[in-house]
Swiss-Prot record:
Molecular function via GO: 3'-5' DNA helicase activity; ATP binding; ATP hydrolysis activity; DNA binding
Protein's name according to its UniProt entry: General transcription and DNA repair factor IIH helicase/translocase subunit XPB
Main location: nucleus
Signal sequence extent: none
Disordered as annotated region, ranges: 1-27, 743-769
Any one GO cellular component localisation term in the record: transcription factor TFIIH holo complex
Domain Helicase C-terminal: 546-704
Biased composition (Polar residues): 17-27, 749-764
Residues binding ATP: 342-349
Matches recorded under Gene3D superfamilies: P-loop containing nucleotide triphosphate hydrolases
């Protein structure tokens, strides 16, 4: 084990044993270095006490002064990035080499915020792990960072990159001819791993059939001839370094004497075979030894599993960013497991289908709901030449026989992970799924399932390659990092604004419309203690209703197609029936849904439909150009992005600046304003801006708007106050994403459940439940009641 390797093993306190230490952020790493006394002293000597030692206010997030620690290069104006000692990187989007620099940073760092002019990235161990997984070498990362940076590359950053990349990506788990091999170009790494008793026990001694065995180590030696995998659709996958290192557009910055590429075409790989039953244990031990394995599939040389006759249709066109994402997946003639992050409406499904057409083996698609299963089947038939008989669905309502040879099976996470008793028909299909050797598993919305569900799904299915697809790779319980090893590293993440500028996404105007509460409604809002009734009052605010009707009239006159979203079923029905429009929610039958959507798409007289949260992810209506949101799921950032995605698909160019419109109607001076601000955060980080409309121009002159008179408003208030507590609750579906994260427990009642109350704290109301995907209950500290002021204690006592 090298000295660099040993730096990752820290002795703590008086403990005599060593424990593996991983870092979630660069700050954690730096703090650990300082504690251990290994921080680079030469760097500290170049700064005075005030700049080297952060004050308490700086540690809490105040501005940091690096002026005395960082020296600008003379030609800094021609270089696009700022590399800070804390691992943050800032990119100027107006640079002449922005595109190449952006591609490089996406490969090595995590995007934090990407507005119009300056992008922020953060170096993390996992982002660097992903970088080496697609072929980048340690020295290449450091060299290119140094050349692109306006500042001399901080020594702390260089040391961090070396620490994180020296072991990542050097060990691969390959499935060849139905045998598992641990493979590496570094025999000393394999020797180190075999010193572990668990890995040594799992090893299978090689045979001298077609392999060359090193007599000293006993490793199998293969001479790799790298040709690259031909991706369906004509793309040749890159097999070594990221193209940014070889791009001529980097001009003089990257055209120096040092070579930027490494020729791997004549490289020898060493490997040893392991017992298939002990693969999970080997992966676990490799992670603990700081050598996480990459999983790659030599699909072209797989003669054991039958080929699937599937190709993209000649009319199917792959976009450049989809090609780029797939080039990260296919290299060295193999398919590597990982995650692709693309915006809503940018063609995640087509990327997955293209991967399936490239591998040409049995495909398993895992979705979040039965509606998504139908969508995936439609997408396979739309983009590929696969035959109907080769596609099978496995849901609670459709249990179709799986093809005896190769085929595509589409099911849900809950169907595969279900641990209870099954029907004979379901059990037979499930046995086929667990016993088959799948070439590729596509995991749709890969971020929504908790770690326990992931491990079970991935344990019961045997797959050569796994590809996760998502638009919002968000988790706040740190479980998102587990995906690096359960699925694989993040292979690619697209920039929303760049795709919008290129015409691949609609140019959306995002607005927050403030709707003042009427005096009568606001009075009831203030004096009512029921959270459900408060929510119903600000949702049914007459001024919000009038704003919604006004916007519908305005955009219908323009010829737009409008979707109005409401999580609250009572409000959904009240709005839709009051305005004479079709509506869809949980209990709406499948036939009626398809009928309404068909009319919306093809009937010019049907320009507006109302939809509950069933439409967040399960509809595909390219014709929609306007979203109006009257009720939402508290502070869910994910839902905001998903709803925006309903209108992100490319639109015909319009005379104005925007060709799509997103309105969020918010009752002024209520909790809804706080939730709205929280919901927008993810989209703001992607570069979108929300303008506030405090008053819709012309709304007071619009005639015949409902609830314009005082008497109509009082009648509506009486109806709202007369409703029960359940009317103020949001619709929560049996197949809701959040149900999946909570275990998807179904109600035993035979009656259809369209809404229910969920227990929790104020963190849940602010969107915490959407973002905290946890396997366990939150610590008691989060549920404790804070100390109350004496005034409020007395008030509570008086109420009793």
């Amino acid at each position: 084990m090298s000295s660099g390797d040993s730096n990752l093993k820290r002795r703590r306190g008086g403990n005599t044993g060593q424990s593996s230490k991983s870092y979630n952020t660069w700050t954690d790493y730096e703090e650990d270095l300082e504690e251990s006394g290994e921080f680079n002293q030469s760097i500290k000597k170049t700064t005075n006490t005030s700049s080297a030692t952060l004050t308490s206010s700086e540690e809490k997030g105040s501005l940091l002064d690096y002026s005395k620690r960082c020296i600008l290069k003379q030609d800094n104006k021609s270089r696009p990035i700022w590399v800070c000692p804390d691992g943050h990187i800032f990119l100027e989007t107006f640079s002449a080499i922005y595109k190449q620099a952006s591609d490089f940073l996406v490969a090595i760092a995590e995007p934090v915020c990407r507005p119009q002019n300056i992008h922020e990235y953060q170096l993390t161990p996992y982002s660097l792990y992903a970088a080496v997984s697609v072929g980048l070498e340690t020295n290449d990362i450091i060299t290119v960072l140094g050349r692109l940076s306006k500042l001399a590359l901080p020594k702390e950053v260089e040391q961090f990159v070396r620490q994180c990349t020296q072991s990542y990506g050097k060990v691969k788990l390959v499935l060849q001819k139905n045998k598992y091999f641990v493979e590496s170009a570094y025999p000393e790494v394999l020797e180190f791993l075999l010193k572990d008793s668990s890995i040594a026990t799992a090893r299978i001694k090689p045979t001298l059939e077609e392999s060359v065995v090193d007599p000293k180590t006993g490793f199998i030696i293969n001479k790799e001839v790298v040709t690259g995998a031909q991706i369906s659709g004509g793309l040749q996958a890159n097999q070594s370094l990221d193209p940014v290192l070889k791009n001529d557009a980097l001009s003089n910055l990257l055209e120096e004497e040092e070579e930027d590429t490494v020729n791997n075409s004549d490289q020898h790989f060493h490997s040893f075979e392991i017992d298939p039953q002990q693969v999970e244990e080997v992966k676990k031990r490799c992670i603990q030894l700081d050598y996480p394995v990459l999983e790659e599939y030599d699909f072209r040389n797989d003669t054991v599993n039958p080929n699937l006759n599937i190709d993209l249709k000649p009319t199917t066109m792959i976009r450049p960013y989809q090609e780029k994402s797939l080039s990260k997946m296919f290299g060295n003639g193999r398919a590597r497991s990982g995650i692709i992050v693309l915006p809503c409406g940018a063609g995640k499904s087509l990327s997955g289908i293209t991967a399936a057409c490239t591998v040409k083996k049995s495909i398993l698609v895992l979705c979040t709901s039965a509606v998504s299963v139908e969508q995936w089947k439609y997408q396979f038939k739309l983009w590929s030449n696969i035959e109907e008989r080769q596609i099978s669905k496995f849901t609670s309502d459709n249990k179709e026989k799986i093809s005896n040879v190769a085929g595509v099976t589409i099911t849900t996470y809950t169907m595969v992970a279900f641990g209870g008793r099954r029907s004979a028909e379901s059990l037979k299909i499930m046995n086929e799924i667990t016993n088959r050797e799948w070439g590729l598993v596509l995991l749709d919305e890969v971020h929504v399932v908790p770690a326990a569900m992931f491990r079970k799904v991935l344990t019961v299915t045997k797959a050569h390659c796994k590809l996760g697809l998502t638009a919002t790779l968000l988790r706040e319980d740190e479980k998102i990092q587990d995906l690096n090893f359960l699925i694989g590293p993040k292979l690619y993440e697209a920039n929303w604004l760049d795709l919008q500028k290129a015409g691949f996404l609609a140019n959306v105007s995002c607005s927050e419309v403030w709707c003042p509460m009427t005096a009568e409604f606001y009075k009831e809002y203030l004096i009512n203690d029921s959270q459900g009734k408060k929510k119903l009052l600000y949702t049914m605010n007459p001024n919000k209703f009038r704003a919604c009707e006004y916007l519908i009239r305005f955009h219908e006159q323009r010829g737009d197609k409008i979707i109005v979203f409401s999580d609250n079923v009572y409000a959904l029905q009240k709005y839709a029936k009051g305005l004479g429009r079709y509506f869809i929610y949980g209990p709406t039958s499948g036939h009626e849904r398809m009928s309404i959507l068909s009319k919306f798409q093809h009937d010019p007289t049907v320009r507006t439909i109302f939809i509950s949260k069933v439409g967040d992810t399960s509809i595909d209506i390219p014709e929609a150009t306007v979203i109006i949101q009257v009720s939402s799921h508290y502070g869910s950032r994910r839902q905001e992005a998903q709803r925006l995605g309903r209108i992100l698909r490319p639109k015909p160019k319009s005379d104005g600046l925007y060709n799509a419109f997103f309105y969020s109607l918010v009752s002024k001076d209520t909790q809804e304003m706080y939730y709205s601000t929280k919901r927008q955060q993810f989209l703001i980080d992607q570069g979108y801006s929300f303008k506030v409309i405090s008053e819709l121009p012309g709304i007071d002159q619009e005639v015949n708007l409902k609830y314009s008179s005082k008497q109509d408003q009082l009648d509506l208030l009486a109806q709202v106050l007369g409703e029960g507590e359940d009317s103020g609750k949001n619709e929560i579906l049996e197949e809701d994403f959040d149900d999946i994260t909570r275990g998807a427990k179904k109600s035993k009642s035979s009656a259809p459940t369209v809404s229910r109350t969920t227990g929790g704290s104020t963190r849940a109301l602010s969107g915490g439940n959407d973002m905290n995907y946890m396997e366990y209950q939150a610590p008691a500290i989060y549920k404790s009641i804070p100390t109350q002021h004496a005034l409020f204690k007395q008030r509570a006592k008086n109420k009793q």
